[in-house]
Amino acid sequence: MNVQDRRRLLGPAAAKPMAFSNTTTHVPEKKSTDLTPKGNESEQELSLHTGFIENCNGSALVEARSLGHQTSLITAVYGPRSIRGSFTSQGTISIQLKNGLLEKYNTNELKEVSSFLMGIFNSVVNLSRYPKSGIDIFVYLTYDKDLTNNPQDDDSQSKMMSSQISSLIPHCITSITLALADAGIELVDMAGAGEANGTVVSFIKNGEEIVGFWKDDGDDEDLLECLDRCKEQYNRYRDLMISCLMNQET
């Protein structure tokens, strides 16, 4: 016995299935955040990205490439997170700078740079807004390579390594600033820095205030000349950070 399911709505016996023509779906093009500073600055190109790590509060990627060097930094921000124990009237910041797979820099150098960065961002982050809270910042040096293959002796190589780690500091500051902004952490101002022959100067407030000064061992130069060169780089990096954050919002 043929029993028909009366709950189903059946069409006519001669009905045919509908046929659809092949259509192309338009996929909107993603906006590029690759930014190149104007000027000579050793023909250095910068690529800035934010918000690409899901399991943290804020993240940033800074890729820098010049004719002789290439660097890639990833920064992850966790917090503000409550601190158990005694009450603190303002938040605390911890910054850890870690090597990538190459293990290029020793631990003491990285700790020294981390302490320098903490001094800067203790002045930049509005810690009074985060009582009894901690903000943990991790900077990973994922790629750092010298593109020149010139053979060097041990002394020259040691000086080059010292110069390279000082040239990393402005990119660390840029990456941390972008990651903090991505995490929604309140900042007094956007911090940036420039480097000139081993001297690093970090600025805020359009270059009117210095929040950090780093000087490698080496030949002493005219500090005013280094200051002007660092300030010029700071203004360039600051404009790039603002453009990056504006592009992420649109």
UniProtKB/Swiss-Prot annotation:
<dbReference type="InterPro" id="IPR050080">
    <property type="entry name" value="RNase_PH"/>
</dbReference>
<dbReference type="GO" id="GO:0016075">
    <property type="term" value="P:rRNA catabolic process"/>
</dbReference>
<dbReference type="GO" id="GO:0034475">
    <property type="term" value="P:U4 snRNA 3'-end processing"/>
</dbReference>
<dbReference type="GO" id="GO:0005730">
    <property type="term" value="C:nucleolus"/>
</dbReference>
<dbReference type="GO" id="GO:0000176">
    <property type="term" value="C:nuclear exosome (RNase complex)"/>
</dbReference>
<dbReference type="GO" id="GO:0006401">
    <property type="term" value="P:RNA catabolic process"/>
</dbReference>
<dbReference type="GO" id="GO:0071035">
    <property type="term" value="P:nuclear polyadenylation-dependent rRNA catabolic process"/>
</dbReference>
<protein>
    <recommendedName>
        <fullName>Exosome complex component MTR3</fullName>
    </recommendedName>
</protein>
<dbReference type="GO" id="GO:0071038">
    <property type="term" value="P:TRAMP-dependent tRNA surveillance pathway"/>
</dbReference>
<dbReference type="GO" id="GO:0006396">
    <property type="term" value="P:RNA processing"/>
</dbReference>
<dbReference type="InterPro" id="IPR001247">
    <property type="entry name" value="ExoRNase_PH_dom1"/>
</dbReference>
<comment type="subunit">
    <text>Component of the RNA exosome complex. Specifically part of the catalytically inactive RNA exosome core complex (Exo-9) may associate with the catalytic subunits RRP6 and DIS3 in cytoplasmic- and nuclear-specific RNA exosome complex forms. Exo-9 is formed by a hexameric base ring of RNase PH domain-containing subunits and a cap ring consisting of CSL4, RRP4 and RRP40.</text>
</comment>
<dbReference type="InterPro" id="IPR027408">
    <property type="entry name" value="PNPase/RNase_PH_dom_sf"/>
</dbReference>
<dbReference type="GO" id="GO:0003723">
    <property type="term" value="F:RNA binding"/>
</dbReference>
<comment type="similarity">
    <text>Belongs to the RNase PH family.</text>
</comment>
<keyword id="KW-0698">rRNA processing</keyword>
<keyword id="KW-0694">RNA-binding</keyword>
<dbReference type="GO" id="GO:0000467">
    <property type="term" value="P:exonucleolytic trimming to generate mature 3'-end of 5.8S rRNA from tricistronic rRNA transcript (SSU-rRNA, 5.8S rRNA, LSU-rRNA)"/>
</dbReference>
<dbReference type="GO" id="GO:0071028">
    <property type="term" value="P:nuclear mRNA surveillance"/>
</dbReference>
<dbReference type="GO" id="GO:0000178">
    <property type="term" value="C:exosome (RNase complex)"/>
</dbReference>
<keyword id="KW-0271">Exosome</keyword>
<keyword id="KW-0963">Cytoplasm</keyword>
<dbReference type="GO" id="GO:0071039">
    <property type="term" value="P:nuclear polyadenylation-dependent CUT catabolic process"/>
</dbReference>
<dbReference type="GO" id="GO:0005634">
    <property type="term" value="C:nucleus"/>
</dbReference>
<dbReference type="Pfam" id="PF01138">
    <property type="entry name" value="RNase_PH"/>
</dbReference>
<dbReference type="GO" id="GO:0071051">
    <property type="term" value="P:poly(A)-dependent snoRNA 3'-end processing"/>
</dbReference>
<feature type="region of interest" description="Disordered">
    <location>
        <begin position="1"/>
        <end position="44"/>
    </location>
</feature>
<keyword id="KW-0539">Nucleus</keyword>
<comment type="function">
    <text>Non-catalytic component of the RNA exosome complex which has 3'-&gt;5' exoribonuclease activity and participates in a multitude of cellular RNA processing and degradation events. In the nucleus, the RNA exosome complex is involved in proper maturation of stable RNA species such as rRNA, snRNA and snoRNA, in the elimination of RNA processing by-products and non-coding 'pervasive' transcripts, such as antisense RNA species and cryptic unstable transcripts (CUTs), and of mRNAs with processing defects, thereby limiting or excluding their export to the cytoplasm.</text>
</comment>
<dbReference type="InterPro" id="IPR020568">
    <property type="entry name" value="Ribosomal_Su5_D2-typ_SF"/>
</dbReference>
<dbReference type="GO" id="GO:0000177">
    <property type="term" value="C:cytoplasmic exosome (RNase complex)"/>
</dbReference>
